[in-house]
From Swiss-Prot:
Homodimer or homotetramer. This is Polyamine aminopropyltransferase. Keywords: Cytoplasm, Polyamine biosynthesis, Spermidine biosynthesis, Transferase. The keyword Transferase applies. It comes from Thermoplasma volcanium (strain ATCC 51530 / DSM 4299 / JCM 9571 / NBRC 15438 / GSS1). Residues 5-238 form the PABS domain. Spermidine binds at residues 65, 90, 158-161. The lineage of its organism: Archaea, Methanobacteriati, Thermoplasmatota, Thermoplasmata, Thermoplasmatales. S-methyl-5'-thioadenosine binds at residues 34, 109, 140-141, 165.
Length: 273
């Protein structure tokens, strides 16, 4: 990817972009599925971009990974013991799940190059893949779920936005297949984009899950390097979801966050009603 005067920019629209001053471009490759770029930035450390969009930075990755793991961890009927992660090739979600004490984690990533880049440049995140409790599978997550005959307490959709290889991860057919592999009291969670800049992604996830699951909720969090800094997640279960009192804290997550993330601004409520 070509830089302009040592700046990497993620374009949100024809009129708006977020730019990071870059000290070095560490990697730029085209895989069978997408383009991967790795930059060393002045303010956020190493930055991983896929198809020109920020996936994570060293400085704020913990926020996203705690939100996509620690919130659903506390929404299952009982403390979960197993999880399926679709996407998440950087290893961040799996690492957080290990910290939460899960006994079995299956991580299915379609693009093996994402894993290799993470092993090379984000060793703390990718260290999860060396743990015997984690089974890393390089495969299409949609196909894996379709043929899966295991049950999981948590299913985490840690994907890119609903286009390209990730488009099918927001489909009714995929959500229907998920219902067959969730254990009693289990939950599914998916990142669902910026309510401000990507309202269609949120509506797609919410309406799809709403047709198949009895209880569906949206929660949000602050992620500085994502579009608008305001990000959504959609969580669903066949059972009523009531948060269990947390016995742990993260760097971002605590008891107040668990309560507060479900308090939605009116414009977000309007999107999903």
């Amino acid at each position: 990817m070509k830089l302009i005067e040592n700046w990497f920019s993620e374009r949100y629209s024809d009129n708006l972009q977020l730019s990071f001053r870059v000290s070095d471009q560490l990697l730029s490759i085209k895989t069978d599925y997408q383009r991967i770029d790795l930059f060393d930035t002045y303010d956020f450390g190493k930055l991983l971009a896929i198809d020109g969009t920020v996936q994570l930075t060293e400085r704020d990755e913990y926020i996203y990974h705690e939100l996509i793991t620690m919130i659903p961890y506390h929404m299952t009927k009982n403390p979960p013991q197993s999880a399926l992660v679709i996407g998440g090739g950087d290893g961040g979600a799996a690492r957080r799940l290990l910290d939460l004490g899960l006994n079995k984690i299956v991580n299915v990533e379609i693009d093996g190059q994402v894993v290799e880049v993470s092993k090379r440049f984000f060793p703390d995140l990718s260290s999860a893949f060396t743990d015997k409790r984690v089974n890393l599978i390089i495969d299409d997550g949609i196909k894996y779920v379709r043929k899966c005959n295991e049950k999981f307490d948590l299913v985490i959709i840690d994907s890119t936005d609903p286009e390209g290889p990730a488009e099918g991860l927001f489909s009714m057919e995929f959500y229907s297949d998920i219902t067959k592999i969730l254990s009693d009291g289990g939950v599914i969670v998916s990142q669902s984009g910026s309510p401000f800049y990507q309202p269609k992604a949120l509506k797609l996830a919410y309406t799809g899950m709403r047709r198949l699951f009895k209880d569906v909720k949206v929660y949000t969090g602050f992620i500085p390097t994502y579009p608008s800094g305001f990000w959504s997640f959609t969580i669903a279960s066949e059972d009523a979801m009531n948060p269990r009192k947390p016995a742990i804290k993260g760097k971002y997550f605590n008891e107040d966050v668990l309560d507060g993330v479900f308090k939605l601004p009116q414009f977000v409520k309007d999107l999903i009603t």
